[in-house]
Design a protein with these regions (language model features):
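Bacterial N-terminal signal peptides
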Residues: 5-17
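Charge-biased low-complexity segments
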Residues: 23, 140-141, 160-289
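Scaffold/interface architecture of coatomer-like assemblies
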Residues: 104-105, 126, 269
Length: 289
């Protein structure tokens, strides 16, 4: 009985401290003082919570500059992993913060204070979650103040996401597959190379375009989303993975669209074969009617 209680205590201790060994970097939210201030306040919120080690702001800034990071929120998995390796933390936060003068039919003049936040896993390069809290007020200072008041809730949601990702990635590393993954050939770079190898690339029956979601419209987001899609020998879409993320709901819109598509399968020497293809979608805000 004593051993059982001791084992439970050790398990609880390890669970409580597994996050403390993980770290997070917060990259400045743009070059403005507003962006730097919000990033620093977010670091302070993380430190107060105590769940994760928080990287030094100056070291984070130097590491990001050292690999040429210039503020993009539209990265490939490789680019995201490279940035994470330079920052030397388990997770990192990217973003953008501004206070903008706006106008509308209802309000001739008002101010919007917003903060775009992307949480990224350094190990996988995946975009774990994104958020864009926004507050309007007739005075810029009050709009900004409302945004700052929201940072406690924002940091709490990010901490929950990091806890979940820590556990998920730990399980990914420990799970042993019961059978080897099927070998799926990657598509050659272009049709000429494919033809020289006796192959024909998959072709969609009908090209579908993802809808531009309202969440992207609110942010005036323009970005490129790349997905790697496995097309079976029957022409049906299997696994779809984001390899260049953009946030703002664009990734989800892309995956949902690709999964609705049907293809003429790839051929090799006249025989249908499964193939992994890269599909790219460029998003631009539609013009106003």
């Amino acid at each position: 009985m004593i051993r059982f209680i001791h084992a439970i205590f050790v398990l609880a201790f390890l669970t409580a401290n597994c996050y403390a060994n993980s770290s997070v970097s917060v990259v400045d939210f743009g070059a403005s003082e507003t962006g730097k201030s919000v990033a620093e306040k977010l670091r302070a919120q993380f430190r107060t919570a105590g769940d994760f080690l928080v990287a030094d702001a100056d070291l984070t800034r130097s590491a990001a500059m050292g690999v040429g990071y210039a503020g993009s929120l539209n990265l490939t998995l490789d680019e995201a992993r490279d940035l994470g390796a330079a920052l030397a933390s388990d997770f990192y936060v990217l973003g953008d913060t501004r206070v903008l003068r706006r106008s509308s039919f209802e309000k001739p003049v008002y101010f919007e204070a917003y903060c775009t936040v992307f949480l990224v896993s350094s190990r996988t390069g995946r975009l774990l979650t994104w958020s864009r809290p926004s507050f309007n007020n007739a005075e810029p200072g009050k709009a900004y103040g409302l945004l700052l008041q929201n940072l406690a809730d924002l940091s709490h949601s990010l901490i929950i996401a990091m806890r979940r990702a820590t556990e998920d990635e730990r399980l990914e590393r420990t799970v042993i597959p019961t059978s080897p993954a099927p070998l799926i050939e990657a598509a050659p770079d272009d049709e000429k190379v494919a033809a020289a190898q006796g192959m024909r690339l998959p072709r969609p029956f009908k090209r579908l375009r993802p809808e531009y979601p309202d969440s992207a419209a609110l942010a005036d987001a323009e970005a490129t989303v790349d997905v790697a899609a496995e097309i079976g020998a029957d022409g049906e879409v299997g696994d779809v993975q984001i390899v260049r993320w953009a946030g703002f709901g664009l990734d989800q819109a892309t995956v949902a669209t690709v999964k609705q598509m049907h293809f003429f399968p790839a051929l090799k020497n006249g025989t249908a074969i499964p193939m992994r293809v890269l599909l790219r979608y460029n998003f631009r805000k539609p013009p106003k009617d």
